[in-house]
Amino acid sequence: MGTYVVRRMFSTVAVMAMVGIFVFLLLRLAPGDPAAMIAGKSATAEVIAGIRQQMGLNDPIPVQFIRWVRDILGGDFGTSIFAGRPVLELISQRLEPTLSLSILTMVLSATVGVCFGILAAWRAGGLVDRILTGFATLGFSVPVFVVGFFLIYFFAIKTHWLPVQGYQPIESGFWPWLMHLILPTITLSIPYLAFIARITRASMLEVLSEDYMRTAAAKGASSYSMLVHHALKNAGAPILTVIGLSFAGLVGGVVITETVFNIPGVGRLVVDAINNRDYPIIQGVLILVAGLYVLINLAVDLSYTLVDPRIRY
Amino acid sequence: MVMGSFLRAFDPVSTTDDTSQSHGLAIFDTLFALDSKFMVQPQMVQKWGISDDQKTYTFELRDGLGWHDGSAVTAADCVASIRRWAQVQSGGQLMMKRVKDISKKDDRTFTIALKEPLGLLPEILASAPPLFIMREKDANRPATEQVTTNIGSGPFKFNEALSKPGASITYDRNEKYVPRRDRADGFAGGKVVNVDRVIWENIADQQTAYAALQAGEIDFIQSPSVDLLPIIESNPDLRLQVLDKGGRILLLRMNCLQKPFDNVKSRQAILHLVDQEAFLQAAFGNPKYFRTITSLFGNDTPYSNDENTGWFKKGGDPETAKRLLKESGYAGEKIVILQPTDWAESSNATQLLAAELRKIGANVELAPSDWGGIVERRAKMGPVEDGGWSLFITDHSNYSTTQPHTNIDLAANGKEGWYGWPTSNEYESLRAKWLEAKTLEERKALAREMQKNYWDIVGMVYLGAYVQPSARRMSLTGLIGMPAYLPMWNMQKVSG
């Protein structure tokens, strides 16, 4: 397994390098000029040209690329064109909100989604199955911003139970942190929960029709033991894959929820950076998210060995 | 507080962005400032005088000026700041053409020596974007390189520990700031801070911002979207307030270097085509917040006039526009209109413009992109086939029309000027006289002459004027209403 992990770590570096090259070139080819964005709406072309020169944006693209690679290899992801602060510092400021939201969302989605999936498979074709399948379809169909505003209206504006927006770091206390994350977590969980429930149901249905399940029933195993110990364990690999990929997707893709609830996370950081053409931030975030994505995939692959002893690396 | 756009650039000198200027007003101070009647008042300056030959100005700083790092503000800081500001701001560039020397005399006194008299010097020093005074070591950096230390001598201190660029910016009251004794008046007077802390939140979604305002989580939205205005108006806890009563002017720039708008007749065609009310309706919806505009010098300014405004009539005149376009020799060349997809009002007006042009037989193509894409493309002078452009819509403040000597939108100096690059030597010779005019009456007369010429050459076309109401909770009072920028002193939060 050690060799496998090392090989995968090398592939992570290769993926990050490819993402880096791709993003760097794409940004230079895309329309837009950070110097013009800094200078403002009424700036003259002369002033913008001066800022471009100062920022080194007039250098040939290969020169800019070599400079950037050299800095990255030295652990320097650059400095934000607008904020004037190191990119890593800005990303680290935004990681906590995004990770908090992503982890809570995954915990809620996985717990409830897997339970719903098991229940639906257990009572396949029955009323419970129909209700849960209907909920899953609805969860997929309703956009997160609609759910978000609906929750804000009832739980923040009408009842004042929860805040409308914003984020409190965990160091300011567990409850303030949690209170600010309840509505965004529920909002973001619904589509993931629905997805996990559907995958769990499908996997469980496949396993429940296997011969060994009939054997377990003949042995007199309880419903709980059959579902959790026999069926779920065998249906676990695709569920783990979905949970892992969903988590990876969440870290880089929670921008709508972050926007609706004004959570200063990585998604908002990168969208603002794209609007401002803040190249160092875009490059830094995308490379790190790509690395994270690959690492989460690795963790998912390794976790297969926990649910299926036949898998060896 | 939620600002019209979130703070992107910290250095208010290297940008013309309005939010950066509001940031500057919070943490920096200025030598002079405009009061609510746009008259120049001393701010950091205690007293100032001019030599008998009108060529040397002497300025003395007032007592008690100190930087947020604890050191004292000196004349050397002012000299370096003026030089840096003059590198990029049009008023400063204009001034430097006449400046022989700027030097400090002692720690509190400096002089500006001129090659020839410049009566408007105090106005230039007070004009927008403001001349913010920075520490000498910051101001010694090129103006094209951003200063992000955020250490000023203004009434607020930047709280770096609590600020998260792009997410929230925190300002604390500068306890050591010594306000002038006068009453707060526009950007001038005593900058008395009545709150301990101000936080700017970057709430990108307007609906969320409104919900937060309603729930009392925030106190102020500088530019609520048009669709939210009726809802805000009906909420008894909230109030809409127009802070910039002069408002802004939506305007159309035409590429005067390329076909078809290199021909004055085609530009005149646009002038006749535009039905301002229709454009304003498309862009802003509610007539309560917009009005038409015919004077180059804005609505209700000292220089507003009706010279050469015969082209204006309610409803536009497509027939005349069609005739003029034909007379210009237009042969179906492609007209590319830049459409900002992230600026709803301008985008709507752009689509209407395209429809109106098609009606008179023009071959129009929209080029949608975010504003970032437009600011890059608008700099291209070449033909549309080489990535150039024909038309784009932008805006400027109504107040800025009173400063034709510094407002680059109002220049007609060809390639040296602003995007669109109209050229008129006659107009430029009139504009140059603005600095020489000694009285208001002389400037008023000059404004009429300039306007007569400008609406003949049609360097740009006005689409209408609008005001942007801000939304605040009733508990937030004392906001100062001035064009474009938001001063935060004087405001207070009362219970309830």
PLM regions: where:
Chain A
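Membrane-embedded alpha-helical segments of multi-pass transporters/permeases
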Residues: 16, 20, 24-29, 145, ...
